[in-house]
């Protein structure tokens, strides 16, 4: 089974988002970053998917992780068997 596509909804100056991007990049994960601060349509998409108005939000296929730190991110990836 292929790994789910990872999409990170973030904002440019969000420290939690920067940490998540660094964490994923340093471990070799492939992911798409969507800046909801610059793209209103993407913000509405994130809000519709997650019922959240704050970032970060990580979408991995049908699974979502919201308002997280890197420890929670690592746990989420492991629990769902998502590898780089």
Q: Which residues does each PLM region occupy?
A:
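ATP/adenylate-binding site constellation spanning eukaryotic-like Ser/Thr protein kinases
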Residues: 11, 51, 70
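Short alpha-helical
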Residues: 15, 41, 72
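Thiol-based oxidoreductase modules, predominantly thioredoxin-like and allied folds used
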Residues: 31-42
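Non-catalytic, surface beta->alpha helical segment in thiol-disulfide oxidoreductase systems
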Residues: 61-84
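Local sequence-structure signature of Cys/Sec-based thiol-disulfide redox active-site neighborhoods
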Residues: 1-30
């Amino acid at each position: 089974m292929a790994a789910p596509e990872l999409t990170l909804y973030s904002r440019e100056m969000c420290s939690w988002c920067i940490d998540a991007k660094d964490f994923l990049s340093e471990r070799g994960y492939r992911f798409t970053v969507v800046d909801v601060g610059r793209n209103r349509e993407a913000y509405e998409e994130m809000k519709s998917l997650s019922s959240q108005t704050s970032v970060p939000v990580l979408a991995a296929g049908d699974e979502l992780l919201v308002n997280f730190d890197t420890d929670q991110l690592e746990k989420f990836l492991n629990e769902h068997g998502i590898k780089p």
